[in-house]
């Protein structure tokens, strides 16, 4: 049975919740975490980590198939799908076990059950009421169907898509954002016939237009049938198939994945009991220190505004705890949070797109460079990758960075760091980069923005 009171109680043990709990323990707070389902939350168990485990398999398979381009002769690789799923489970177990170990190491009590608010400073779990000076709600988000349909049968969400019982022959994905594009890219390379639908006019519609174009070409090269500006309608599911129409044309697939967004998971929190207010869009209202309208109650992650990203939730958890401890904190500049999409080709980005910068009235300067312009692009066999820097002309401000291609999800961090340290694209252009590396493409994009591109 849990103790009657704690300094800090965190509801939810995902990347936001468990990081908040560990930081609270580091600051000397008596801390407990309430988790109803699995340690590590959805990210570690059914979303981010399982997705990347399967995507890594698809990456390895692609490398084997392309080995002949590098002078290595191999036959057509054989896919062992049960082994892929077994490795996926091993990865999950390793990482969730690591989180449980960190709880133990830091003296954090894990309480299994459904946590909710009873009043300001009081939570309920398993019929017990527990007092806490600080409560942090970090319950994440849940899948959301598209209008006119519901989940069930052969209509599934992104979480189920990464744990299918068998490798499907056919699959349709509705929504070509980050999650949908990752699912489509993974299964297409594993041999599935994939249909990808997007209601807007391009894939990855939140990314810069130039990046979306490169990604769409890459997805089509993998055999994916991409349909933009298209709605899926008349969805019907049977025991073994899902039928639907697009533009009046009938289709039939083994699975239909809805990847069009998620909703905050607040149903069991009893927020009214503590006076926690929701915004019109259903998100919890918070200030820059993650404080809700209820004294001593904080909210983080997918429950609040900003991008629904694990690393953003983790940082918010630290901010909430440090504010509760009386330390100085600074609100997150959400536009500068890096985004990483692990479809092939990879995408890494932050900040404003070119269109957004122009709409906001900046005197915009753009620097672009394809990977093929630097030696490492040819060495790695990726000459079509692209680095794009969006800047402000007068002061050299770095407004946004957008990369598509090999290691884009790693390369973007350089531009994020330059921005955080108040540097601009002239600094990117002048910093010496190792040779031959893909990071030289970032440097050259900085030079292009600054008006003195060397390799181009």
Model-identified regions with their sequence ranges:
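Gly/Ala-rich phosphate-binding loop of Rossmann-like dinucleotide-binding domains
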Residues: 21, 25, 184, 188-189
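FAD-site-proximal beta/loop scaffold in flavoenzymes
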Residues: 152-168, 250-328
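Short hydrophobic core segments
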Residues: 9-11, 115, 130-140, 173-174, ...
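Flexible, glycine-rich terminal cap/loop adjacent to redox cofactors
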Residues: 9-37, 42, 49, 53-60, ...
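Glycine-rich flavin
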Residues: 2-6, 22-29, 34-167, 200-204, ...
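Beta1/beta-strand and adjacent pyrophosphate-binding region of the FAD-binding site
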Residues: 2-14, 167-177
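N-terminal Rossmann-fold NAD(P) dinucleotide-binding loop
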Residues: 17, 180-181
């Amino acid at each position: 049975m849990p103790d009657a009171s704690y300094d800090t109680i965190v509801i939810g043990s995902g990347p936001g919740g468990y990081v908040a709990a560990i930081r609270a323990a580091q600051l000397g707070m008596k801390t407990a975490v309430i988790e109803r389902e699995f340690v590590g939350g959805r990210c570690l168990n059914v979303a981010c980590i399982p997705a990347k485990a399967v995507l890594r398999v698809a990456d390895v398979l692609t490398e084997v198939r392309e080995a002949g381009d590098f002078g290595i002769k191999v036959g057509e690789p054989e896919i062992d799908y049960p082994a892929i799923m077994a490795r996926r489970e091993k990865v999950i177990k390793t990482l969730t076990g690591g989180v449980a170990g960190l709880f133990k190491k830091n003296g954090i009590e894990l309480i299994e059950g459904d946590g909710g608010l009873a009043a300001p400073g009081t939570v309920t779990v398993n019929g017990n009421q527990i007092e806490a000076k600080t409560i942090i709600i970090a319950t994440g988000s849940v899948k959301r169907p598209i209008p006119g349909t519901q989940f069930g049968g052969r209509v599934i969400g992104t979480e189920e898509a990464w744990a299918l019982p068998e490798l499907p022959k056919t699959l349709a994905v509705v929504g070509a954002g980050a999650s949908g594009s990752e699912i489509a890219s993974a299964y297409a390379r594993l041999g599935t016939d994939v249909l990808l639908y997007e209601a807007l006019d391009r894939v990855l519609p939140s990314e810069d237009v130039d990046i979306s174009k490169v990604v769409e070409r890459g997805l089509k090269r993998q055999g994916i049938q991409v349909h933009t500006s298209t709605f899926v309608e008349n969805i019907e599911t049977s025991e073994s198939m899902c039928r639907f129409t697009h533009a009046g044309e009938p289709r039939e697939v083994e699975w239909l994945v809805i990847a069009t967004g998620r909703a905050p998971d607040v149903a069991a929190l009893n927020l009214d009991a503590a006076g926690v207010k929701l915004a019109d869009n259903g998100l919890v209202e918070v200030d820059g220190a993650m404080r809700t309208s209820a004294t001593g109650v904080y909210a983080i992650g997918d429950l609040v505004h900003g991008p629904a990203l694990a690393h953003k939730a983790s940082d918010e958890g630290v901010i909430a705890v440090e504010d509760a401890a009386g330390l100085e904190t600074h609100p997150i500049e959400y536009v500068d949070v890096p985004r990483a999409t692990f479809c092939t080709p990879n995408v890494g980005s932050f900040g404003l797109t070119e269109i957004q910068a122009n709409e906001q009235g900046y005197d915009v300067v753009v620097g672009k460079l394809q990977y093929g312009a630097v030696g490492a692009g040819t060495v790695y066999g990726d000459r079509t990758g692209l680095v794009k820097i969006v800047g402000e002309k007068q002061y050299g401000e770095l407004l946004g960075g957008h990369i598509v291609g090999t290691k884009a999800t790693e390369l973007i961090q350089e531009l994020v760091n330059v921005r955080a340290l108040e540097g601009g694209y002239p600094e990117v252009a002048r910093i010496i980069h190792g040779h031959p590396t893909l990071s030289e493409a970032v440097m050259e994009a900085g030079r292009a923005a600054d008006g003195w591109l060397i390799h181009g």
